[in-house]
Amino acid sequence: MKNKNYLFIFIIGLLYVFPIVLANVYYVDDMGRLSLGYGWDGDGRILSNVLTEALSFGNGIISIFPYSTLLSSVILVISGIIVSDMLFENKYLKYISSLFILTSPFMLENLSYRYDSILMAVSVLSAVVPFIFRSHYKLFFATSFICLLISFCLYQTSTMAYFSVALCLLIKQCLNNEKAFDFRLCLNSLLCFLVSYIVYSLLISFLAVNMQRSGFITFDADGFDMILSRLRSYESYYNSLYVSGFKYVIWPCVILVLLSYINLILKGREFGRLLLSVVYLLGVVLLTMMP
């Protein structure tokens, strides 16, 4: 992409978050951080305090709003550009899709936090960057380990973006008649995630961090109940989006996807590949509910 196109995308991203800047409100945790000055130690986000102190030049946990919101927008656009460049050849699709991460309705809440938004944005970027090196598996493993560890230490939920990108790459391969199931990519991604999570857990234990929240769902009855609770809450979110007028955005996208699959079937693409790509797509959706 040419530099002027990059600039145009970044301008759109900044305009998108401008209403948040103009609203100038403190959102949920912002009020506690402002009045009590507490950080993210109890969340297991051990790098969050470090990064925030660095941004304030050692002056403690202070708000750099609106610069934090604007910088978060830039970082999320960069993340989107990295992903869209991997997935699409058409330049117009690249331009449009590079804004999808930033403009996700669920990301809008994250952008509303004065203190946390930039940490979340850097965490998302860290989860995306390793796939730049996906063709070089040793480098991919090393960068995945480092970047995922950073992501865990900033905002654990963002690590799910790592698997989402991997699934998107598998969808692309299915539709392009490449490997329908890339065992090497899947194995390396899973191993990198497990190793980084183990190291993160050991680090939390070594530093004696008391995890008050932000842990991952456990594989037991309580974990199953939490999954059901998440599914119900997301059903409520989607219903709220749908009745708010977001359906006018959703339905054209759904129709375009269906027409694309029909077109591929008529062109003689293997039905098994198309079905597998749908499974991968559902996996991307589910990953947003399971952190």
State each model region's role:
Residues V83-F106, L125, K138-L139:
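Transmembrane-helix signature of polytopic, membrane-embedded enzymes
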